[in-house]
């Protein structure tokens, strides 16, 4: 026992002597640059780069029957250098693993029975680090310092209590040659650092840095690398110190995935309501910016911004064309389907069964001069057909009413003269079947009488003349008949076609006869309608009633309107809530030629607007919306390919389209004599091909009624020494009516004459310049047949028209394709010479046929 203890003491003493000769100083990591302090004692710590397996305490004899194992200290004769530089070089370049005790055993004698093992990655010139002494000296007072109290062979404090050969605390439990804790478990030859990271650099196992080498790549890391867009490949040594921000977060963990997904969702293009842009939208030829944004589920500001980038400065109310809308929608991956706005406003006509037609009452309008008794005549006719006890007599005015006679019903329009009549006609409404022209027997024909005649003739409506006030002593009916005959209204008594009735509205004379004449004229006209179809009519007048809302008087022209029917009135839609007749009584339905007051309209329509009952309320709203858009765009005058009224410049186009059969003119002059002279001069220009019709002439300034008449009749206005005021000019621009001003009569005639001459078909004169006889036919592949000809008269020109004549019958009429003399192309061949002729579009030549060349001269025609 004493010998063995002596041996241990000698071993420890030998190690102490060796340390005196070359003292080993190992500094803590991070204290390499710090100066040693004299106040605190120097401490020897274990180098992190070379962990050594601690030796177990020597057992006593009583613990085991075996002899204790004694490991001799290194030989004192061989000096071993322990330098920090060797550790750095080995750690930074070779990447070697820590040496274990069994790899560094050396006999005391220094022989090589226990060779020192090298790291497979160690360079040949590196210093070999051997293991430390097999036994740590036991401190007499264990514990203290930052490591805490510890017993023999144990560490405390931040490292925790460790059993033999184990490390605790933040490093965790480690097996032999392993590191634990936040650094993770490491195999042999691994460097310490913040855990094992593959593909990194610096401390720990990161490739490309000091002391690093690639770690095995797991499947989870490969998937994460692919998701991040990283290759996961290791970089070369010394080239990864400068890293981008994207490289630093390549493998920062999957906890950021949710954050990036949220960021991505916020950048998705969505609409105002969170709905994505549709794949296809339908727009009209012109669309408002705000409406386009609504259709695409986008904010108006986004659409305006896109248009500004396209070079268009617009606002939400501006209108763009369909092509621009398509380009903008394409930026969002949306297709645009363009539809015609005008077609969307048209209501399809319902098919009628001819067997359902029945006779309908006539619709009559009363016209005439202001003081000739129009209103009195209307009141007399109405009171004669209304019983006083029936709803208190006449209680309201609705603009139209029906009267009962012994022979049938008659509908009268109670409108303020021909002004309303013309206004409705200007909007395209044709509601009147017969016009009653009232003329006072004691006054004669007045200017308003002539205007009423012009309006009635322009509407192509038959006229019945009612000579009123025959009860007065100064009445002269024959004088009235003579004056009206001079204006084209010749009485049947005098061999004409106009019916005259002598009445007295105040004395109720001749009223029944007037009603009979009206019904007789209606029978001649054979007026019919179909009551079994949906209602179709015209708005006579409309107003806003404080108690009932929008109220409109509708004249049903075809079909039957019932309570509850959806409808479209002009640009507004609605559903019939209630209907009233001219007596104010509630009714359930209204048939053809029946005037009714209708409630339930979304707005107040214009007089003369069309009224159509619909099968579906949704369809009615859609048509109403399209008509409102159509009106906003400014195409309200467009209809069936014609978007403007006739002018002197576009008359030729109207003639070709068949939309104009005659030129209608309104003449206004400073004096009546000038107006009559211009009228007579222009009427002489009328021809069977182009007719000129002066629908009205008179003295005075051009007023609004002249413009409305021209608009309704599609006529132009000629002003001679007179002009229109600014208000009338604005109305003419709105109605697209042309006004021409002149100061000399022959200027009027010459300009109208030139315009009408342009409408005449030019005269064509044909001149035969030569003939050729076909004597032989040559067939050439890929070219066709060539006619070998002899010019028999005149000359054949290449630029001339030709016709092929066979047995006196023209087989073909066209142009020459080529003309050759021998093999040369020539422009003409005269009589007596042979030539080769190829006709464009014709190959069926026969020997003996004749080719005739001719020219056509166009001569412009003039009015005589």
UniProtKB/Swiss-Prot annotation:
Q: Where is this region: G3?
A: 414-417
Identify the main location: cytoplasm
**Which organism does this record belong to?**
Leptospira borgpetersenii serovar Hardjo-bovis (strain L550)
Kindly provide the name given to this protein in its UniProt entry.
Answer: Translation initiation factor IF-2
Which residue stretches belong to region G2? 393-397
Q: Where is the composition biased (Polar residues)?
A: 106-120
- Which InterPro entries does UniProt cross-reference here? EF-G-like_DII, EFTu-like_2, IF2_II, IF2_N, P-loop_NTPase, Small_GTP-bd, T_Tr_GTP-bd_dom, TF_IF2_bacterial-like
What phylogenetic lineage does the species belong to? Bacteria, Pseudomonadati, Spirochaetota, Spirochaetia, Leptospirales
Residue spans of biased composition, Basic and acidic residues class: 78-90, 239-252
Q: Which GO terms describe its molecular function?
A: GTP binding; GTPase activity; translation initiation factor activity
Query: Bias regions of kind Gly residues — which residues?
Result: 150-212
Identify the stretch(es) annotated as G4: 468-471
Question: Could you tell me which residues belong to the region G1?
Answer: 368-375
Q: Which NCBIfam families match?
A: IF-2 (TIGR00487), small_GTP (TIGR00231)
Q: Tell me the segments the record calls region Disordered.
A: 1-252
